[in-house]
A protein has these predicted regions:
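Motif-centric detector for short Cys/His coordination patterns
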Residues: 2-192
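Active-site environment of non-heme Fe oxygenases that use a 2-His-1-carboxylate facial triad
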Residues: 169-209, 214-464
């Protein structure tokens, strides 16, 4: 879900967003308060031998409030009340048994052989208990399974009773965010207890970017800051980069030219997730302001005001390439590329913006009737991207690094003179998401996610 941040202001044009179910928030102070309330807990794995189940905390239901159960040869139906029922296929229930014989309590991997389950399997009994639905399977494959009520409600698919788990709420922002941009200090990010790291990555998850102040103006300190999140991803530019405008690489970034708002790696099948960069020095010149644009904010306006253009950008693949080095040639697979806007196929949520007009290849994949509509759509997209309402300009200096979600926030710069020294790194989206998920378990655990005094990850975790 997207939220419009009231503290960053909204123009008359973007007020339309509020009618499109965007809720206002009071800047990111609410997030800071939320983080301050989070309690720490150990995340160490249990040392118990395999197949010995760690204590699993299963919420109980009073016997008077037990759901009603009905079953036939295909499904088990659960009546939560007189009006709400969930139906689960028998084979689905058997496949999702999480006893130690069917689901490893330590590795959290499936042990049951899905393909040995008879397709027409039918329980011999299904009964409600305080701990959950207890299912006894037929004598041909004798087994007993227990499913907590909260787990069944969360995973109900016929019908879906709860909104599918998505990423944390995204706070979309305009240029007005310059009044109070999300920021953490270097000391917070590097603190051993990882609370500051959780605050940092939570800002990135909410806003798609975050500044880090007080960074020692050295490549070594910046590299350690990058590694705080996860492995640095190596590309044709190396692992950790430290560069100037000397065209050491065949890319416009290695010049003094202006760069329009873009995401990196559109020529990759899997663009890098995060990009951190730090201006170490700028001597004998001027210019070089950093440009940041929230692609989700711009996409929300495009969808509200120009739904046809939005649809074109969501369905039309755009080929791309990186061909500035004679010994290298990059293009995504398939070569037809990917749309500018990518959505979760289940929830419909916008999950990625992929846009760099400079790296775009020949658009020879358009049908004749699509050509004019596509150019009209990217013209509208460009107009919104480059509006004063969308563009957040900031002059970085030594000691202040910025990290952006390369799947959401576009970046660029103004032209400059003199000599600039910049360093930074890419971090994979999966490494970033893994670190954030682990820190969330540690500092803001879901009641269904932890079990026992050791707070090991529960087999009933919503993420599993």
């Amino acid at each position: 879900m997207w939220m419009a941040c009231s503290s960053v202001g909204v123009s008359a044009r973007s007020m339309l967003l509020q009618r499109a179910s965007f809720r206002a928030c009071n800047s990111h102070r609410g997030l800071a308060t939320h983080l301050a309330r989070a309690s720490a807990s150990s995340s160490a794995l249990s040392n118990k031998p395999p197949l010995k189940t760690p204590p699993q905390s299963v919420p109980q239901v009073a016997s008077d409030d037990l759901p009603m159960i009905s079953m036939d040869d295909r499904k088990v139906a659960i009546g939560w009340d007189t009006r709400t029922w969930s139906r689960f296929h028998n084979i689905w229930l058997r496949d999702h048994c999480r006893c130690p014989e069917c689901f490893h309590p330590i590795t959290k991997q499936r042990l049951v052989n899905t393909f040995e389950i008879p397709p027409d399997i039918t329980p011999s009994q299904a009964e409600p208990t305080a701990d959950g639905l207890r299912v006894s399977w037929p004598s041909s494959q004798p087994h007993v399974s227990l499913y907590p009520w909260s787990w069944l409600q969360r995973n109900s698919y016929d019908p879906a009773l709860k909104q599918r788990e998505t990423q944390l709420e995204k706070i979309i922002w305009s240029s007005k965010i310059q009044a109070s941009p999300p920021t953490v200090t270097y000391e917070e990010a590097m603190a051993e207890d990882e609370r500051g790291l959780y605050k940092w990555l939570s800002h990135v998850d909410h806003f798609g970017m975050c500044f880090i102040s007080g960074v020692p103006p050295t490549p070594e300190a910046t590299e350690e800051l990058s590694k705080r999140i996860g492995f640095i991803r190596e590309t044709q530019y190396g692992k950790f980069w430290d560069f100037t405008s000397d065209l050491a690489k065949g890319d416009t970034a290695y010049t003094t030219l202006a760069l329009g708002a873009h995401t990196d790696n559109t020529y990759y099948t899997d663009p890098c997730g995060l990009q951190l960069f730090h201006l170490l020095s700028h001597t004998e010149g001027s210019g070089g302001s950093t440009l940041l644009v929230d692609g989700f904010y711009v996409a929300s306006i495009l969808k509200e005001l120009h739904p046809d253009a939005y649809s074109v950008l969501a369905r039309t693949p755009v080929p791309a390439h990186a061909a500035g080095e004679p010994s290298e040639f990059y293009q995504p697979y398939p070569a037809s590329g990917y749309p500018v806007l990518t959505h979760d196929p289940v929830t419909g949520e916008l999950i990625q913006v992929r846009w760099n007009n400079d790296d775009r290849s020949v658009m020879n994949n358009l049908d004749p009737y699509q050509v004019e509509a596509w150019y009209a759509a990217i013209r509208t997209w460009h107009k919104l991207l480059t509006s004063a309402d969308s563009e957040y300009w900031v002059q970085l200096g030594p000691g202040t690094a910025v990290i952006v979600d390369n799947h959401r926030v576009l970046h660029g710069r103004s032209a400059f003179t003199g000599r600039r020294r910049m360093c930074g790194a890419y971090i994979g989206v999966d490494e970033y998401r893994s670190k954030l998920a682990v820190l969330r378990e540690k500092f803001n655990p879901n009641p269904d996610n932890a079990s026992g005094p050791e707070t090991t990850r529960s087999i009933w975790s919503p993420a599993l």
